[in-house]
């Protein structure tokens, strides 16, 4: 099987000697409702995980929650509650929505707040080694021009133009230096650690510490949206090297974002399309269906009309599926009419998770299923084929 590796910019053969895999996906910063962009990212990742499991791998899936950030502190202050009381509300809302979308649960969910001690320890080591420096706005790590570009594959000036982060603001020696330990924030929790001023951990180091604490290195596959390539994933990888972790990750995979009729949905516009709003008009299973009709790396168009059409098609395709899946399944590979469909389906997923091609197989299966139902034909292998779609794509659950 071949996956697109952001680090190389090409599809690469994915082959491991061990059947045990470690996968890490950057989780949400839990300060607002789960939105359409979240659905795109986590459904796409779920297909990867399901496919690898189907192929016989034993997957350890780690996902974090960023529960210490500028946004969580501001939200807690706004609502007049403790920061962790605030974030736990949105953690639950996120997990409830992921379950509605039929996403599988992570092997373990980590929280930035649980790793503050380790983050502080590594920050102090970087200060002692001279890799980091302290200002009145926090502790920053020095990042040189040559450190960047392993994921973006551009030079310093170009990567600076790609994006900035509020988390990285402050009196820095270089624009690319990144915050390791920031000052206390109104509304947020802070920690007192010997050797550091009272404060809070920085975003990028949080993920480096959480992932390396829970998974053997190198991580087999690290996933996130393309908006996380820079500065987050670039910096996460650099920090892993600076704290002595060595080669951090073998495969970096990134999903595209959502876009509307005017073009790419910005983060703020995407967040305004909450899943609770969408689920009032469209069942979660239909949204999952819609997302799978687009490749994970592509920008996925969103309009209410396009989603409505997907709902209608998903409902139509589900009719024959329900009728067939009441029959005990047999292996569709033993059925001359279905064996080619199994091959097409598996080849599609093996080619960088080509779910649009896999969905075309589903449409062809629907035709065959309809004919056999009319002719009182053998539905057992049809049921088996639908079970594969249920297992790998999370449809018809």
Predicted regions and their residues:
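Structural preference for alpha-helix termini/caps and helix-kink/transition segments
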Residues: 264-267, 271-397
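Alpha-helical recognition segments enriched in aromatics with Gly/Pro capping
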Residues: 1-31, 46, 117-323
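The substrate-binding groove and active-site-proximal loops of carbohydrate-active enzymes
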Residues: 76-83, 107-113, 197, 225
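Short catalytic-loop micro-motif centered on adjacent basic/acidic residues
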Residues: 61-62, 106-110, 222-224, 380
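Short, glycine/charge-rich beta-strand/loop segments that flank catalytic centers
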Residues: 65-69, 91-94, 104-119, 137-146
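Short glycine/serine- and small hydrophobic-enriched flexible loop segments
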Residues: 50, 212-213, 367
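N-terminal, positively charged nucleic-acid-binding surface of large information/translation enzymes
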Residues: 8-104
């Amino acid at each position: 099987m071949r996956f697109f590796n952001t680090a190389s910019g090409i599809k690469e053969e994915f082959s491991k000697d061990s059947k045990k895999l470690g996968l890490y996906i950057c989780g949400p910063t839990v300060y607002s409702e789960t939105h359409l962009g979240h659905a795109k990212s986590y459904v796409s990742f779920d297909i990867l995980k399901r496919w690898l499991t189907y192929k016989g791998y034993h997957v350890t899936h780690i996902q974090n929650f960023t529960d210490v950030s500028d946004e969580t502190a501001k939200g807690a202050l706004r609502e007049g509650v403790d920061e962790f009381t605030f974030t736990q509300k949105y953690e639950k809302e996120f997990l409830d929505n992921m379950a509605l979308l039929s996403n599988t649960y992570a092997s373990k969910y980590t929280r930035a707040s649980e790793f503050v001690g380790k983050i502080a320890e590594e920050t102090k080591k970087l200060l002692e080694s001279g890799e980091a420096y302290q200002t009145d706005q926090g502790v920053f790590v020095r990042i040189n021009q040559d450190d960047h570009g392993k994921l973006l594959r551009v030079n310093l000036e170009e990567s600076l133009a790609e994006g900035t982060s509020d988390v990285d603001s402050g009196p820095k020696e270089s624009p690319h230096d990144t915050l390791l330990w920031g000052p206390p924030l109104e509304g947020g929790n802070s920690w007192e650690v010997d050797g550091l001023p009272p404060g809070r951990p920085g975003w990028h180091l949080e993920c480096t510490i959480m992932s390396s604490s829970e998974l053997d290195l190198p991580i087999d596959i690290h996933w996130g949206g393309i908006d996380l390539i820079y500065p987050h994933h670039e910096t996460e990888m650099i920090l892993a090297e600076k704290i002595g972790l060595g080669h951090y990750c073998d495969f970096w995979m990134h999903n595209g974002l959502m876009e509307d009729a005017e073009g790419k949905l910005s983060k703020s516009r995407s967040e305004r399309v909450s899943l609770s709003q969408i689920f009032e008009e469209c069942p979660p299973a239909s949204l999952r269906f819609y997302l799978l009709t687009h490749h994970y790396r592509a920008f996925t168009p969103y309009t209410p009309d396009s989603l409505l059409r997907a709902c209608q098609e998903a409902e139509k395709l589900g009719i024959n599926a329900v009728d067939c899946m009441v029959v005990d399944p047999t292996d569709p590979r033993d059925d001359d009419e279905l064996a080619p469909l199994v091959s097409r389906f598996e080849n599609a997923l093996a080619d960088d998770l080509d779910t649009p091609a896999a969905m075309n197989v589903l449409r062809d299966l629907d035709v065959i299923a309809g004919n056999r139902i009319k002719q009182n034909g053998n539905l057992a292998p049809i049921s088996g084929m639908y079970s594969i779609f249920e297992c790998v794509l999370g449809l018809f659950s």
